[in-house]
């Protein structure tokens, strides 16, 4: 089944006559339309994209399976017109992507029962197509190449923000639209910050430097993390690094279809606890990656979702000790029938610059 057929099956299960898609990522996933304004209206028999005059040609070109409707009245009125025309009685809308203000407009204009739903398109997005996997591999390759490049740039006296800018510039030169999120460059005491976005701090000898970054390429995200040493580091930092490395290797080795997010999380967390650092690993082991840099499934002590072939996830254990430093190591991988296939291949053994 194609994407529309799969979604229509879900609509049938939910007893919905149609679904209104407001989310830009879900809109892109279902239609391939990359414009910044528009909604999709999908029923058992129709697939409509409603947009304004700025995007009519683009929508017609990109969203070939959809009937293009240009709204010359306010968007909500055009949606109401189409709902009435199609005879929709029960209309699902994406409750996680619609503001209360927009919902109030829908309620006042649309003559149908509005049914809040969540996760329908996101459920389809969990399993990547071959085309998506090819793009994700290319996005990871850009990040790998950027890591190799940045090793020659990092040295004492260089500011974290300059490292971040160099990574971004390099990835753009390799074809990325941008970085897939605000780049994390956290050195020294700041490496104990799990999300230490690059600052004006200068990198010093004797520090660990955590680099968490990825490429946004053809709409899809890569997300890798490597931690390097600048000069000689303390025994404690060595222990932290090698504990994280061993945990990450265990996580990758055990990652496979059929296990739950809780079980995947335990692959790394149990080892870190055994080494006495459990209290310093406060986030989940990983997450899905695709059109969003953080999406399902979760590799978390809260997630009972079962991993399936075709899902793309990160494995990223970390240890963060205040006033000492921290480390995270992260790979992207696709779940396969026989385990997993790495998408990122940058060296993980400790590199000293």
Question: Where in this protein do the model-derived segments appear?
Answer:
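Active-site neighborhoods and metal-handling regions in enzymes and metal-associated proteins
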Residues: 1-353
